[in-house]
Amino acid sequence: MKTHHTIIIAGAGGIAEAVALILAEWSTVTPTIFIGNRTLSNAQKLVKWVEEGTSRDCTIKAFHLLEEGSTEEMKQVFEQGDILLDCLPGTQAPKMAGFAKEYHMHYANLTEYVAETEQIKALAQDASTGFVLQTGLAPGYIDVLAHHLFQAFCKEFQVNKVDTLEFKVGALSKNAVAPHFYGFTWSPVGVATEYIKEAEVIRNFKKTNRPSLSERETIIIDGITYEADLTSGGAADLPDALAGKVETMDYKTLRFPGHYAWVEAQIKKECDSDKPIKALQRMMETHIPHIEEDQIILYAAVQGKDATKTLQRREVAKQILPQQVGKYQLRAIQTTTAVPLIQAAQLLLETDLKGVVLQSELDTNSFLTGNFIVPVYGEV
């Protein structure tokens, strides 16, 4: 941050941890930070962890953030806040956005949950502050990158429509073993959710839905073979924003070969379950270990014909590894999710944006060259 702000972080998990540490360590002017969590001791542990891990002087405090209702302490914290950064599970997003609106704070979140996002869009229509939604890795950075590629392609080749826009992200372990070829590097419920809920795509220039895990493909990125398949949430609002401009567009999740076949077998075993997300989560957690050393693989490409009808393609691929921040090494999933949220926060705090701001509405060039984005993602 370039000037002093008071920033409230809701949550005390791995992403909240990264957001707090990066804010303390990388801000030009260190903000005042409040950490709120339903388990106060977890918020207090995070405060101590940041204080011990940053090389900068930082004012950071914990408070008890209730799941239901509010307290006088919460009210006092919210009245001081300039922005609320929501790192809680997506089901809590409408409630957190409600607090932001009530106390005239800006708000930014990470969730890929579509229904909750629609609730917030309705709530924030007439807000006096700005609400940037779905601003993590996927949805988030990958959508801004894809939109940037689309805009650059249209400008370079003097066209206003393209054939395909594809963007893919994998939060992966460095190694993978049979039979599942996977290791959890982030929330198991998030993985299960994106495998079960439908994906929003563009087909024949129109927004539509497709079942997740229904269009598997093989792709080679930097010489390594992956599988990619449709999953929910990662496309953000691009299916709405680019309908009529892109013939075929989708977001897919990258995995090592063999993983999706294993997942499909588990889903078939639980086909009678009335709670398929919980059933798949339980099945995966029984067999798949959590992995500490991770990597993020991302790929985006746009393809279409130029003015002479020659087929052209532009693409970006990146591998992002764990990174030292202050005295700690953060996992790749932490940094890649945290910095788009922080970059969006800086945008809200240092401009006059109001109401809902979706991923397609962000200025792609300034976002992708942002002072928090570049140290993690590099230049485009």
Task: Label the model's feature ranges.
Residues I7-G13:
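Conserved N-terminal Rossmann-fold NAD(P)-binding element of oxidoreductases
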Residues R38-N42, V114:
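Helix N-cap at the beta1-alpha1 junction of Rossmann-like dinucleotide-binding domains, i.e.
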Residues G53-G69:
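Rossmann-fold cofactor-recognition segment
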Residues C87-P89, F99-T117:
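ADP-ribose/adenylate-binding Rossmann-like module
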Residues A152-V380:
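C-terminal catalytic/substrate-binding lobe primarily of soluble NAD(P)-dependent oxidoreductases
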Residues L110-F131:
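Rossmann-fold NAD(P)-binding glycine/threonine-rich loop
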Residues L66-E79:
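Conserved Rossmann-fold cofactor-binding substructure of NAD(P)-dependent oxidoreductases
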Residues A16-E17:
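N-terminal Rossmann-fold NAD(P) dinucleotide-binding loop
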